[in-house]
């Protein structure tokens, strides 16, 4: 069975360019508002300047079911600081102005509160490429599917090792840009060992579609980035970048991003 993509992807040319360079794309996540709004925007621009191909701009949410402790603490601090959804849109504008490509990662409730079509409209106007929705499944995404078509945005849904063949096919068909493969079960966070379930999950997606696959949930080193970059189209890093920013500021964040960018260029074979 082959699952066809419905429309051209905004992110597609980025993955094509990375393939031409014989490497995976580096996709970095930071939450808006941590440690404060201005610094978070500077940090996202620093990701672009340090070799990040795509920036995931996080919308802090009070009930983050999938976030590990590092990101949960950062988003809690951002919420205490008064961060708003409009700050995320401003961050997207800043990334775009710096020559970067931004997607927003958000739980669905903030989008519902904002208004689905209004959010899609304003994200597109800010220069955003799409939306990652970790707690939204395609079956319940009718409003978002319609809004993404109207405003030309990519939609990135999650697949996991536990996804059934039917669920995998449905999710891949609804996705555009890339699919987000959770390389470990459970919440996000940097780990010493990268899940061995990830290569199999990527293979399962590739059996039914040529959509790019990004693998996340655990990467924190150049070696891990190289390992995942050997079989995935995108290497997604979140908790490790948040930790670097919190512990060492922009200098540490830049250093880690440069290390990870070197890692995806190593194309190490998956172990």
Swiss-Prot record:
One of its GO terms (cellular component) is cytosol. It is an enzyme of class 4 (lyase). PROSITE patterns: TRP_SYNTHASE_ALPHA. GO terms for molecular function: tryptophan synthase activity. The active site is at 56 (proton acceptor), 67 (proton acceptor). Its EC number is 4.2.1.20. It catalyses: (1S,2R)-1-C-(indol-3-yl)glycerol 3-phosphate + L-serine = D-glyceraldehyde 3-phosphate + L-tryptophan + H2O. Keywords: Amino-acid biosynthesis, Aromatic amino acid biosynthesis, Lyase, Tryptophan biosynthesis. The keyword Glycoprotein does not apply. Pathway: Amino-acid biosynthesis; L-tryptophan biosynthesis; L-tryptophan from chorismate: step 5/5. CDD domains: Tryptophan_synthase_alpha (cd04724). Transmembrane segments: none annotated. It holds the Pfam family Trp_syntA. The alpha subunit is responsible for the aldol cleavage of indoleglycerol phosphate to indole and glyceraldehyde 3-phosphate. Tetramer of two alpha and two beta chains. Belongs to the TrpA family. This is Tryptophan synthase alpha chain. It comes from Mycobacterium avium (strain 104). The gene is trpA.
């Amino acid at each position: 069975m082959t699952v066809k993509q419905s429309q051209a992807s905004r992110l597609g040319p980025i993955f094509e360019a990375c393939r031409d360079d014989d490497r995976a794309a580096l996709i970095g996540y930071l939450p808006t508002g941590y440690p404060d709004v201005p610094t978070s925007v500077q940090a996202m621009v620093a990701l672009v300047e340090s070799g990040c191909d795509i920036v995931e701009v996080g919308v802090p949410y009070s009930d983050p079911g999938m976030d590990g402790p590092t990101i949960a603490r950062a988003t809690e601090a951002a919420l205490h600081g008064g961060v708003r959804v409009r700050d995320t849109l401003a961050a997207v504008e800043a990334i775009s102005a710096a020559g970067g490509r931004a997607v927003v990662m958000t739980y669905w409730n903030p989008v519902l509160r904002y208004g689905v079509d209004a959010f899609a409209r304003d994200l597109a106007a800010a220069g955003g490429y799409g939306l990652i929705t970790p707690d939204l499944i395609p079956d319940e995404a009718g409003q978002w599917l319609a809004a993404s078509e109207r405003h030309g945005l990519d939609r990135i849904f999650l697949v996991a090792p536990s996804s059934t063949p039917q669920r995998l096919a449905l999710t891949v068909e609804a996705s555009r840009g890339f699919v987000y493969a959770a390389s470990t079960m459970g919440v996000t966070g940097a780990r010493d060992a990268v899940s061995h379930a990830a290569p199999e999950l990527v293979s399962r997606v590739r059996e039914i579609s040529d959509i790019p696959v990004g693998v996340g949930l655990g990467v924190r080193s150049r070696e891990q980035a190289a390992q995942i970059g050997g079989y995935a189209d995108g290497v997604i890093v979140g908790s490790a970048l948040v930790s670097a920013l919190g512990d060492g500021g922009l200098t540490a964040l830049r250093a880690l991003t440069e290390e990870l960018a070197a890692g995806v260029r190593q194309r190490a074979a998956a172990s």
